[in-house]
Amino acid sequence: MLDLVAAFIALTTLLTYVNYRFIRLPPTIGVMATALVFSLIVQGLSELGYPILEVEMQEIIRRIDFSEVLMTWFLPALLFAGALHVDLSDLRSYKWPIGLLATAGVLIATFVIGGLAYYTFPLFGWQVDFIYCLLFGALISPTDPIAVLGILKSAGAPKPLATTIVGESLFNDGTAVVVFAIILGILQLGEAPTVSATAILFVQEAIGGVVFGAVLGYGVFVMMRGIDQYQVEVMLTLALVIGGAALAARLHVSAPIAMVVAGLIIGNHGRHYAMSDETRRYVDKFWELIDEILNALLFALIGLELLLLPFSWLHVAAAFALGGAVLVSRLLTVGPAILVLRRFRGANRQVPAGTIRILVWGGLRGGVSVALALSLPLGPERDLILSLTYIVVLVSILLQGLSIGPLVRRIYAGQPLEKSEGAH
């Protein structure tokens, strides 16, 4: 196991260096693109009669349980690190767009994408049951801000826009995981559960996650307030994430939601009432480093998964069609939500011009979608959905991620809007 971890970290570090030294793309996008090119080179060498490197790389990647690694270890830490730097007062200011997009938006997207997929699959010769189409809709609905947030900041996006994108993505991961789990349960049971059973499951996972995260966050906050030793306080935050995520799985509550809530408590109340200036610096630097390392590992793994996923040009064509369906669903969820806010709340100040375009095009899909696809039960539907999900995620990160910056600069060029900044 240690040799696997060492090999993967070494390869990711090399890819990160190559991107920073020669390619200069935004870090996460660059690492994934470099890993993708590396995968293509390895496959090319195999076609030329040198298969040994491809065989070795496939063995390394096959031994990594992407779904387990991301959902159990990476995602809780990434969400905690993201929430740690979100100002709670900003989140409250934009709670309506964030709340609508992270809850109703995920549900609407699940059914819109699922419905469009149901009618798209036969066009390419595939007959897929509607329940699998809904699973695809649920797993592809959460957005991933990691690749786009830094670009938005450097491009001068308004603070309300950046806050909405970050806030939505922090919570819609948890919502999507819960919705996915409910639909997967229906598939495995072979019959639809009652409304009361579905409601109980949702309350247990989502509300339970909020309560559990609040208890964890407040407990660690009290412990940090009683000491002034940055080494111990950093260890407390690390134990909160690792131990809290493991315990959440045992309690059958949403670990992603719990880590977001705990991160908000530590990043706001803990920062102001339980940390010295020295502790703040070390906690911030520690979690910034963890965030960068895990993101590099995650996006490198996404790029390297190409070595394991067989797909044809038919898959590529279908993925582009489904990518269009994802954008349509994004427009159908974002557009009405923003228009309603402007109409009934007079929210022009909170919803700058161009918000709909940026939210639609900036709604990148990421590792959570791939991890959920990998957790589907074995069968031809899983293989198909996994290949299509992977291509949709790749295209989303590369196409939308690399073009969102120029779009932001074009929309807000010359406008005296407040630029987004770090939360603290």
UniProtKB/Swiss-Prot annotation:
Its main location: membrane. Optimum pH is 7.5. Almost no activity is detected below pH 7.0 or above pH 8.5. Pfam families: Na_H_Exchanger (PF00999). One of its GO terms (molecular function) is potassium:proton antiporter activity. GO terms for cellular component: plasma membrane. Na(+)/H(+) antiporter that extrudes sodium in exchange for external protons. Also has weak Li(+)/H(+) antiport activity. This is Na(+)/H(+) antiporter NhaP. It comes from Pseudomonas aeruginosa (strain ATCC 15692 / DSM 22644 / CIP 104116 / JCM 14847 / LMG 12228 / 1C / PRS 101 / PAO1).
